[in-house]
Amino acid sequence: MFGKTDKMDVRCHSDTEAARVSKNAHKESREIKGAEGSLPAAFLKEPQGAFSASGASEDCNKSKSNSSADPDYCRRILVRDAKGSIREIILPKGLDLDRPKRTRTSFTAEQLYRLEMEFQRCQYVVGRERTELARQLNLSETQVKVWFQNRRTKQKKDQGKDSELRSVVSETAATCSVLRLLEQGRLLSPPGLPALLPPCATGALGSALRGPSLPALGAGAAAGSAAAAAAAATAPGPAGAASQHPPAVGGAPGPGPAGPGGLHAGAPTASHGLFSLPVPSLLGSVASRLSSAPLTMAGSLAGNLQELSARYLSSSAFEPYSRTNNKEGAEKKALD
């Protein structure tokens, strides 16, 4: 008798528990359906992979395994994946999925013109100026503030792009100039003069340094000697002796104009013919001085010009090549 009563009690308790579980399940299904109805259609069509498992969902899963009811901060929703099957995911209740997106502010042409003018005047508009500008343009202060922030960001980006482009252009120009200088140095010989004056290069400077050409002086030696002899014959006494003195100073008399003394003997007369001076003794002394040290003067002038050319080439793109060429040329000239 008592055993049957116990069995009946157990059976009643099990039926009561089953009814309670079914009621809870029905209530949960209603909540799920309500949540599904409130979600937008685009959200329901998204696959399950679009939602990553966060720490909150893991906490919700742990709490679900521990207790039959979900905590207050969890939200269970149903999502239809790409295959059409419905899956259940758990998200925090703080995630507001129903909130509409913020609309993008569209400015009119007049508003943009006024905002741009104010930005050119002052990049930071605060306080009363911003309030007055927003009132005049029929905008809120937040819209004006956000527009100025975006405009400053755009200006910084543009400045960065401009500086980068400027650096690229300057580097390209420098490279082109260096290549042009290298090409000029390869096609043209570097400026310079030899150490000795007689085999000097052609040009205005060389002709000025040389003065009368050497063949002309040599050719005029015969005429100079004849004129000197005539002057010695006509001049009486000491004048004839004075007129014969310059050839002796210039050098020993040689056989004809091509001899060693031909150049020095013809030099006073050539100078006399050029400058038309009546004093042959003065011309003879000047010619003797010039003929005594032509190599030293030529060497000093050529050395100075070589130094100037080296300084000029030191600022060019082919500096190493010019320095080596100058050194080799100087060594060869010193050996000669």
From Swiss-Prot:
> Where in the sequence does UniProt note compositional bias of the Low complexity kind?
236-250
Q: Which UniProt keywords apply?
A: Developmental protein, DNA-binding, Homeobox, Nucleus, Transcription, Transcription regulation
Q: Which GO terms describe its biological process?
A: astrocyte differentiation; axon guidance; brain development; camera-type eye development; central nervous system development; glial cell differentiation; negative regulation of neuroblast proliferation; negative regulation of transcription by RNA polymerase II
Q: GO: which molecular function terms?
A: chromatin DNA binding; DNA-binding transcription factor activity; DNA-binding transcription factor activity, RNA polymerase II-specific; DNA-binding transcription repressor activity, RNA polymerase II-specific; RNA polymerase II cis-regulatory region sequence-specific DNA binding; RNA polymerase II intronic transcription regulatory region sequence-specific DNA binding; sequence-specific double-stranded DNA binding
Q: Where in the cell is it found?
A: Nucleus
Q: Which portions of the sequence form the region Disordered?
A: 1-39, 50-69, 236-267, 316-336
Could you tell me which Pfam families the record lists for this protein?
Answer: Homeodomain
As annotated, the DNA-binding region falls at: 100-159
- Spans of biased composition, class Basic and acidic residues? 1-34, 325-336
**Annotated Gene Ontology cellular component terms:** nucleus
> What's its job?
Transcription factor that may function in dorsoventral specification of the forebrain. Required for axon guidance and major tract formation in the developing forebrain. May contribute to the differentiation of the neuroretina, pigmented epithelium and optic stalk.
What's this protein's family per the entry?
A: Belongs to the EMX homeobox family.
Protein name, please?
Answer: Ventral anterior homeobox 1
**Which organism encodes this protein?**
Rattus norvegicus (Rat)
Its taxonomic path starts at:
Eukaryota, Metazoa, Chordata, Craniata, Vertebrata
